[in-house]
A protein has these predicted regions:
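Pre-NBD coupling/linker segments of ABC/ABC-like ATPases
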Residues: 359-370
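Transmembrane helix-loop-helix hairpins at lipid-water interfaces of multipass membrane proteins
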Residues: 57-113, 193-198, 309-313
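Membrane-integrated ABC transporters
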Residues: 1-71, 86-99, 117-121, 125, ...
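An intracellular "coupling" helix at the cytosolic face of ABC transporter transmembrane type-1 domains
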Residues: 51-52, 145-146, 162-171, 175, ...
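Helix-loop-helix
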Residues: 89-94, 98, 191-205, 279-348, ...
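ABC-type nucleotide-binding domain
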Residues: 369-612
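Juxtamembrane helix-loop junctions of ABC transporter transmembrane domains
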Residues: 31-39, 62-63, 70-83, 106-153, ...
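Conserved catalytic Walker-motif region of ABC-type ATPase nucleotide-binding domains
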Residues: 140, 262, 350, 377-379
């Protein structure tokens, strides 16, 4: 596993060396800055995303021109041969040989030029595609926890995968198709005006028709694409939710209800997709029919000019070929508009994330090199967005360095909110949360969290091995340290029973392990960081009685000298806590040792009696 990761990193470095520009800021930040500097201008944003690779596009254009030379020269050669034959030129045969060799040479030139063109173009477009995804991932790591709570993960996944793919498709179409269109039209018009101004003027008459067709449908296309994109994001989120909840729906025999609910969502997507398909079909067919009629008119017009002696007979094939080129290329623009509209909408969709200001701002704040673990909650109030009711009401709490504090209370009392304040996920609406006497809102949380370890209520494992999950984010972990943590987390027997031991794959989200096993790995991951502050959100809830007892003993030893916050509904698990804080109505209703609170016979006593 480790070798493969090193190989992946090496491959990424090689690719970045070929594609990444030498910039003062990292690639992800540079992409975000491109969006910020071009807000409201998706095409300008797209162009700036490639700014660092303009030189590759220039080389690609040169190669593109060289590889298509055979196509542009062939109509001229054909017309010249016909004119030589019809005029009985004595050098006709020699000219045919010369033209054939010239065309054959240009055809063979296509092979190396196409390879070089694809190489330059692909490096530039793949760089942008990778850069956008990295920028999105970096931004998602910076966005506040409240943003992630309010935004469905399926929508974010859709932006990272589907929208970036659409932007890459837009880039390819703009470069490959638009470049092809521009050069084909340019060459055709230059050759035409050099031979006949009358025919050139006729060619220009097709432009207004193309413009009218495009303007008519552009606004409709934009609206339909926006509706379809949002519906797809909603569907992606619903599908992800459905997959995660399959065990719940199966356990309660709700399969039919879930299928019916998803069917409604899928039909909504189908309806919007159908309307989009109709618009695209109408758009394409109207454009095609209009330009085909003009092509027939061109044939009649050039034939009339040849009869009048204003052009040679061979020139009819030249103009017909070039007119077909102009018509087909302008028609291609019309056909491309749906793809362009979809890509532009995806550029805007990505911007919704990259330009979000709901981020955790650590710039310019004080960095914490050391943490002792003293906490003070001074008159803290907090409420969640779209909810005027305060979860915490003037909370006051003092926690000494090295103390183990247990937070108890009914569901919704504010226990998890306090933990989120300790971690820094939430910030107090009023009052202060102090860490070692420093306002937590004024410190660089990234430096603070290096001294923090969290075991959440729901164990979260990453795809990979048990070793990868325990040592996640830690470098140079010795085997001795690892074995110590494994023993403390009661994982020794589990690992010994597995054929591959620590190198056993855990599956997606740890699906190959039981809930208790996953939780113990999460605890081991927290312990190996040797933190100064530990947050345990019902960390023993998923363990059986025997494992819970062993883990509790290990935690008592390992939390010594570290400030520890514990949330537990089972009050028997917190008997050894230094202090117990009873949270009720967002306040600290009672605070003391287990014995003190039992003797008080207040709220803690009542909770204990209920559980007994």
């Amino acid at each position: 596993m480790r070798r493969s990761r090193k190989g992946m990193k090496s491959g990424m470095k090689d690719f970045e060396a070929k594609t990444s520009p030498r910039q003062k800021m990292d690639t992800e930040s540079w992409f975000i800055e491109c969006y910020r500097n071009n807000q409201g201008h998706p095409l300008r944003t797209l162009i700036h995303l490639y700014k660092a690779n303009y030189h590759k596009f220039v080389m690609a254009v040169i190669c593109f021109f060289a590889k298509h030379a055979c196509v542009w020269v062939l109509p001229i050669i054909t017309a010249n041969i016909i004119n030589d034959v019809t005029s009985h030129n004595p050098d006709t045969f020699r000219n045919i040989i010369f033209y054939s060799i010239l065309e054959a040479g240009l055809i063979l030139l296509n092979i190396p030029m196409n390879y070089l063109y694809t190489s330059y173009k692909s490096l530039a477009t793949r760089y942008a595609e990778t850069g956008l995804r990295k920028a999105l991932i970096r931004k998602l790591q910076q966005l506040s926890i409240s943003y992630h709570v309010e935004t469905q993960s399926g929508r974010l996944q859709s932006k990272i995968m589907r929208d970036v793919e659409a932007v890459e498709g837009l880039s390819t179409q703009l470069f490959l198709s638009i470049l092809n269109i521009a050069l084909n039209i340019g060459v055709a018009l230059v050759v035409t005006i050099s031979k006949s101004r009358i025919v050139f003027i006729f060619f220009l008459l097709t432009t207004p028709v193309a413009a009218i067709t495009m303007v008519t449908f552009r606004n409709i296309m934009k609206k339909r694409n926006t509706e379809f994109r949002k519906e797809m994001e909603e569907t992606s989120a619903r599908v992800m939710e459905m997959v995660e909840l399959v065990p719940v729906t199966r356990a309660h025999a709700l399969e039919d209800e879930e299928v019916a609910k998803m069917s409604g969502q899928l039909f909504a997507v189908a309806e919007k997709g159908y309307k989009l398909d109709l618009i695209q079909a109408l758009f394409g067919s109207v454009g095609w029919a209009v330009f085909q009629i003009f092509q027939v008119i061109c044939l009649a017009f050039t034939g009339y000019l040849a009869i009048g002696g204003k052009i040679q007979a061979g020139d009819i094939t030249l103009y017909q070929s070039y007119f077909a080129t102009v018509v087909n290329q302008v028609s291609s623009i019309v056909t491309l508009l749906p793809t362009i509209a979809k890509g532009i909408e995806s550029v805007n969709s990505i911007g919704e994330v990259l330009l979000s200001e709901d981020i955790e701002d650590n710039e310019g704040k004080e960095k914490l090199e050391q943490v002792t673990g003293t906490f003070d909650f001074e008159d803290v109030c907090f409420h969640y967005k779209n909810n005027e009711h305060n979860v915490l009401n003037h909370l006051n709490l003092h926690v000494k360095s090295g103390e183990t504090i247990a937070l108890v209370g009914e569901s919704g009392a504010g226990k998890s909110t306090i933990l989120n304040l300790v971690i820094g996920f939430n910030q107090a609406e009023s009052g202060k949360v102090l860490i070692d006497g420093k306002d937590i809102s004024k410190i660089d949380l990234r430096t603070y969290r290096k001294h923090l370890a969290v075991v959440p209520q729901t164990s979260i494992l990453f795809s990979g091995t048990i070793r990868d999950n325990i040592t996640y984010g830690c470098e140079n972990v010795s085997e001795e340290e690892l074995q110590k943590v494994i023993k403390a987390a009661n994982l020794s027997d589990l690992i010994a029973s597995l054929p591959k031991g620590l190198d056993t794959m855990v599956g997606e989200h740890g699906g190959k392990l039981s809930g208790g096993q996953r939780q113990r790995i999460s605890i081991a991951r927290a312990l190996i960081r040797d933190p100064k502050v530990i947050v345990l959100d019902e960390a023993t809830s998923a363990l059986d009685s025997i494992s819970e007892k062993l883990i509790q003993q290990a935690l008592n030893n390992l939390t010594e000298g570290r400030t520890t916050f514990i949330v537990a509904h089972r009050l028997s698990t917190i008997r050894d806590a230094d202090r117990i804080a009873v949270i009720a109505d967002g306040r600290c209703a009672e605070y003391g040792t287990y014995e003190e609170l039992m003797a008080l016979q207040g709220e803690f006593y009542q909770l204990k009696q209920i559980q007994s």
